[in-house]
């Protein structure tokens, strides 16, 4: 199963407004998967949100969820699935960019 197939499988039944999946890899193998959550948060999410001036964005982002789970990672891939089942543009927000820069 490639990364797109994995992301589609994980996102297909989600009902949130933004269906976003982040997958970390190390030497081409998946090391962690993160999905965005509007009901959960994490202290690291809050810390990063405050640092970039968006304290209100404390819900757990997919990228941060994946980075917290990954023991090793040399790449992170972000996917967004539209309500119609097509892939949409996805890129990390300022909060997640900071998390990625701190990690790498």
Where do the language-model regions lie?
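Zinc-dependent deaminase catalytic domain
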Residues: 1-104
